[in-house]
Swiss-Prot record:
Keyword Disulfide bond: no
Alphabetized Gene3D superfamilies for the sequence: 1.20.5.170, Hexapeptide repeat proteins, MurE/MurF, N-terminal domain
Protein name (database record): UDP-3-O-(3-hydroxymyristoyl)glucosamine N-acyltransferase
Top class in the EC scheme: transferase
EC number: 2.3.1.191
Family classification: Belongs to the transferase hexapeptide repeat family. LpxD subfamily.
Free-text function comment from the UniProt entry: Catalyzes the N-acylation of UDP-3-O-(hydroxytetradecanoyl)glucosamine using 3-hydroxytetradecanoyl-ACP as the acyl donor. Is involved in the biosynthesis of lipid A, a phosphorylated glycolipid that anchors the lipopolysaccharide to the outer membrane of the cell.
InterPro entries xref list: Hexapep, Hexapep_transf_CS, LpxD, Trimer_LpxA-like_sf, UDP_GlcNAc_AcTrfase_non-rep
This protein's pathway: Glycolipid biosynthesis; lipid IV(A) biosynthesis; lipid IV(A) from (3R)-3-hydroxytetradecanoyl-[acyl-carrier-protein] and UDP-N-acetyl-alpha-D-glucosamine: step 3/6
Amino acid sequence: MSSIRLADLAQQLDAQLHGDGDIVITGIASMGSAQAGQITFLSDSRFREKLSSCQASAVVLTADSLPFFTGAALVVRNPYLTYARMAQLMDITPKPAEDIGAGAVIAPDATLGQRVAVGANAVIESGVVLGDDVIIGPGCFVGKNTRIGAGTRLWANVTVYHDISIGERCLIQSGTVIGADGFGYANDRGNWIKIPQLGRVIIGDRVEIGACTTIDRGALDDTRIGNGVIIDNQCQIAHNVVIGDNTAVAGGVIMAGSLTIGRYCMIGGASVINGHMAICDKVTVTGMGMVMRPITEPGVYSSGIPLQPNKEWRKTAALVMNISDMSKRMKAIERKLAKN
């Protein structure tokens, strides 16, 4: 969409219009950079003072923030959610042609649905099934007998190994690898013996996976990613991991094998989670969390020492290193006091 009247935008967003509905909106921008012709949003009332200097032609905000802005506005309950919907309307992501690119190799027995696009130099192996409106970007590899559901898009250079199942309306960013061997080895008197990984990866519907993330195939049981899961860039998801519906995983997270994560969880960036255990539904792990034990109660969990000036951090680290000795001394003092 190149432009839209503010009144028409309000109707599409189910927003209450205040001001001139004939204003033409040509784009969306942050409050600090928005100019005439653009629309912005205020999702945090702490930044209301910025409204007085805002140059946008219109602002999306809540009813209690409306008195702080004199220009045209769209009043909604959740400005951030409305921003997401506006961004979808104004998305400038290029739409690929519905054709087969130069140098693409497609096995004769692969099944392609209607309006499928396969980019240049992509490889589609034997037995693959691609649903309607699937987009396979340039340089992608889709291994034997893999199934990809309708409306799913793989950006350039995604690798999907054999016997993988990806649901409908998924989005997988460039460089991601799905279905590589999990880290499975047996030790024979100092020599590592590889264990073939016989499981698969099963990905549900409406899953989004960021760039350069790796999801390993199961050793025996399948690695499973539930419906509506969102996974950021550069995450490592080991074999046999199960992630429940609508869980969010931020960048750089490492999940060890045979971990089960429940539904509606949020895992902060750079967290490390031990394997062979479970995390229940509705758990939030804050950034750089180190999860070594199962979590059985919903809630917010944190670990680690927040950033401090180096001198203060060194003192804190020294205290942590000596906490066992201090505990022993405290118990000895308590025993003496109890005798008295």
